[in-house]
């Protein structure tokens, strides 16, 4: 969902499931609209199967937000992925935002399918997360992020259900916003740490052509049920690089020897981080 600052937002939720739900607009102030905060038995009655509820509020908080179900959060958010991004564009962006040529959202989550099955039998969570994803997909099925040399890329990072340590190869990140709010002093970072519910905006100047990976730096988050590589990994690919599909779903993509040898023959970038002085020298003045 994407709106502009000051818009009157009206969203009608129709419950076509067999469970009760509400929608919480995470990060919204809900000034004079507390009935739309989505907290069951506090601001509203839960929306039961077959019912509808309309949320109405003014988009008075700008930046990267998100929405999620607020009923039985460990199950509905943690296991059933009932969440999504909610972007409110400001009337007056900060100067560096005006340079952005490409905008992308990365939402991080994880789950354990065995626990999800036990929920249906009245079970409870407690087992470790075994699958990790970006925008609902695990590597090597994550959607590649394609850019052009010279792009100014903004990544909106959202930790939906788990801790994240995001790291892109081959490029600097300038951290400009936290939880939707612009920072008084943007700073460079090599790794961004997020806790569940946190959001960061980072800007990257795409000046290092090749094919690179970006991933969660928590080691087991880059696996699928213990098989690596997988999980929270995606490819950043520059326009003009030969577009073969080595990273699409293949059994051998789970083979570490393939990943660290065969993949490196597919163009510069993978595991080849050259020393460079940085993308934002103005911050060092």
What are these regions (language model features)?
Residues 20-23, 113-118, 165-166, 245:
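Short, solvent-exposed loop/turn elements at domain surfaces
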């Amino acid at each position: 969902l994407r709106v502009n600052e000051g818009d009157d937002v009206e969203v009608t939720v129709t419950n076509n499931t067999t469970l009760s739900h509400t929608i919480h607009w995470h990060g919204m102030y809900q000034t004079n609209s507390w009935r739309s905060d989505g907290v069951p038995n506090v601001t509203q009655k839960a929306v039961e199967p077959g019912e509808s509820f309309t949320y109405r509020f003014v988009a008075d908080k700008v930046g990267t937000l998100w929405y999620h179900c607020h009923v039985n959060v460990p199950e509905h958010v943690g296991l059933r992925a009932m969440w999504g991004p909610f972007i409110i564009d400001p009337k007056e962006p900060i100067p560096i935002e005006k340079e952005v040529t490409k905008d992308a959202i990365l939402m991080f989550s994880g789950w354990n399918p065995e626990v999800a099955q036990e929920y249906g039998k009245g079970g409870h969570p407690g087992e470790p997360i075994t699958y990790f994803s970006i925008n609902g997909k695990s590597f090597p099925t994550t959607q590649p992020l394609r850019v052009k040399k010279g792009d100014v890329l903004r990544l909106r990072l959202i930790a939906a259900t788990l801790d994240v340590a995001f790291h892109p190869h081959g490029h600097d990140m300038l951290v400009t916003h936290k939880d939707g709010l612009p920072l008084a002093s943007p700073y460079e970072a090599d790794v961004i740490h997020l806790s569940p519910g946190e959001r960061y905006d980072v800007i990257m100047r795409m000046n290092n052509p090749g094919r690179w990976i970006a991933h969660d730096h928590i080691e087991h988050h880059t696996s699928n049920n213990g098989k690596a590589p997988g999980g929270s990994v995606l490819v950043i690919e520059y326009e003009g690089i030969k577009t073969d599909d080595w990273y699409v779903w293949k059994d051998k993509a789970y083979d570490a020897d393939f990943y660290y040898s065969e993949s490196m023959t597919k163009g510069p970038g993978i595991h080849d981080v050259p020393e460079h002085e940085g993308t934002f020298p103005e911050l060092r003045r």
